UniProtKB/Swiss-Prot annotation:
<keyword id="KW-0479">Metal-binding</keyword>
<keyword id="KW-0560">Oxidoreductase</keyword>
<dbReference type="GO" id="GO:0044423">
    <property type="term" value="C:virion component"/>
</dbReference>
<dbReference type="Pfam" id="PF00107">
    <property type="entry name" value="ADH_zinc_N"/>
</dbReference>
<feature type="binding site">
    <location>
        <position position="166"/>
    </location>
    <ligand>
        <name>Zn(2+) 2</name>
    </ligand>
</feature>
<dbReference type="GO" id="GO:0008270">
    <property type="term" value="F:zinc ion binding"/>
</dbReference>
<dbReference type="InterPro" id="IPR011032">
    <property type="entry name" value="GroES-like_sf"/>
</dbReference>
<feature type="binding site">
    <location>
        <position position="231"/>
    </location>
    <ligand>
        <name>Zn(2+) 1</name>
    </ligand>
</feature>
<feature type="binding site">
    <location>
        <position position="174"/>
    </location>
    <ligand>
        <name>Zn(2+) 2</name>
    </ligand>
</feature>
<keyword id="KW-1035">Host cytoplasm</keyword>
<dbReference type="InterPro" id="IPR036291">
    <property type="entry name" value="NAD(P)-bd_dom_sf"/>
</dbReference>
<dbReference type="Pfam" id="PF08240">
    <property type="entry name" value="ADH_N"/>
</dbReference>
<dbReference type="InterPro" id="IPR047109">
    <property type="entry name" value="CAD-like"/>
</dbReference>
<keyword id="KW-0862">Zinc</keyword>
<dbReference type="GO" id="GO:0016616">
    <property type="term" value="F:oxidoreductase activity, acting on the CH-OH group of donors, NAD or NADP as acceptor"/>
</dbReference>
<feature type="binding site">
    <location>
        <position position="163"/>
    </location>
    <ligand>
        <name>Zn(2+) 2</name>
    </ligand>
</feature>
<dbReference type="InterPro" id="IPR013149">
    <property type="entry name" value="ADH-like_C"/>
</dbReference>
Length: 422
């Protein structure tokens, strides 16, 4: 049965019933198939020459159709290919959705995991899951935002809204599958589990997001620096908060990169004695001189590591690749906790090492909507902002090697508007 036939079927059923429950069911079906019909007519990302960027004015494209618009983004058409300019369609905002013109998008190491095929992805792929921009349109029933508001978006942009995780605002752990801003199935009206087309992320000039997953940006922070708060900030704030980090605690931050450097600032603002643990010489110095750590350790220096054995109350590891965590477990006090947030790869741990160094090993994934609001308020109160390097999109392909070589200071952020003003 075609979408048109399904729409006619439920429209006819709706016209022939007075049962309120059935009316609700039929309306949900109609809305779902209408939205699916819109999505079926959207063009997928495809390469375009940069010389024609000026033909795709956001203002002009937005006015051409009641249901969709042409968008520009930066992504890849297949695994391992270079990031390039792509053109594609976005739908316009419908119920409870806002349309955001993207100003700045951070480059997370996980973006590269997908681009190069270290993690499974659907192609074409437009990455980007930490972004800041301006509301340019709102759909029906939007009551939290107005046109012109400066807002930010994190990786999770939808969830079922009904399960135990969602009702406790831990939407990233939705029991029916959270939808992330890219490389995930869209949740259509009436869906419990997402069944729609693949999402495209923030390396683009516009995005449509449900208002529940949009966050007001604190006015006292710098807009060009703070896109990474929406992933790196949320991902590190959540486990630090849940560990009740505070005065009198010795806290280690392992891996001083995009996540770790923000974690140092957050843990310090929480009142802890913060020790930065890194393998990189310049970060060993910069962690204390610039980021505010009380001490730093070179993880490659056995003597330095030995001096701190058995002394940490909590360790947060942000290393974004498979590695041996035993040297860090040995730094913990008896039955203290180490939390890993960067390493989402298979890890082998010898049970004897855990037996000899009893500890709690845990992980964490981004943050729920309430914690993200808390994180933004906390960073606003303590004037915490990421240290970033602003780039244009034509430099995206250079960033992976620099990240691998620990040359980024500390997060790359794409200036989307400057990238498209050619």
């Amino acid at each position: 049965m075609s979408l048109e036939e399904k729409l006619n079927k439920y429209s006819n059923k709706l016209s022939m019933t007075n049962n309120l429950n059935k009316i609700d069911v039929y309306n949900k079906k109609i809305n779902k198939y209408k939205e699916r019909q819109i999505y079926s007519n959207l063009k997928k990302p495809q390469p375009i020459d940069e010389s024609v960027i000026s033909l795709y004015s956001l203002k002009n494209e937005y006015q051409k159709s009641p249901d969709k618009m042409t968008a520009l983004g930066f992504g890849v058409t297949d695994v391992g290919k270079p990031v390039e300019l792509l053109v594609f369609d976005r739908k316009k905002p419908t119920n409870n959705e806002v349309s955001i013109e993207i100003y700045y998008t951070g480059i997370c190491h996980s973006d590269w995991h997908f681009i190069v095929g270290e993690w499974k992805a659907d192609f074409p792929l437009i990455p980007g899951h930490e972004l800041i921009g301006r509301v340019i349109d709102i759909g029906p029933n939007v009551d939290k935002y107005s046109i012109g508001d400066i807002v930010c978006v994190s990786p999770v942009i939808d969830s079922c809204g009904h399960c135990k995780m969602c009702t406790h605002h831990i939407e990233q752990h939705c029991m029916n599958g959270a939808t992330e801003i890219y490389n995930q199935k869209t949740r259509l009206p009436g869906d419990i589990k997402p069944s729609g087309p693949i999402t495209y992320g923030g390396y683009s000039n516009i995005v449509i997001i449900k208002q529940h997953f949009v966050y007001k940006f604190p006015k006292n922070l710098d807009i060009e620096r703070c896109a990474p708060l929406m992933c790196a900030g949320a991902t590190t704030y959540s486990p630090l908060r849940q560990a009740k980090v505070g005065p009198g605690m010795k806290v280690g931050i392992v891996g001083i990169g995009g996540l770790g450097h923000i974690a140092v600032k957050i843990a310090k603002a929480m009142g802890a004695h913060v020790v930065a643990i890194t393998r990189t010489e310049w970060k060993f110095k910069d962690s204390v001189n610039n980021l505010g750590a009380n001490e730093s350790i070179l993880s490659t220096n056995v003597w330095q590591m030995n001096q701190h054995k058995g002394s940490f109350d909590f360790i947060l590891s942000t290393i974004p690749m498979a590695h041996d965590i035993v040297p860090y477990i040995e730094l913990l006090k008896y039955k203290a906790t180490i939390c890993t947030v960067g390493e989402l790869f298979p890890t082998v741990i010898n049970g004897m090492d855990l037996a000899q160094h009893p500890c709690f090993l845990q992980s964490s994934l981004i943050a729920g909507s309430d914690e993200i609001k808390e994180m933004l308020a906390f960073c606003s109160e303590h004037n915490i902002m990421p240290d970033v390097q602003i780039i244009k999109a034509d430099k995206i392909n250079d960033t992976r090697q620099k990240l691998l070589e620990s040359k980024a200071k500390y997060r790359y952020v794409i200036d989307i508007r400057a990238s498209l003003n050619k």
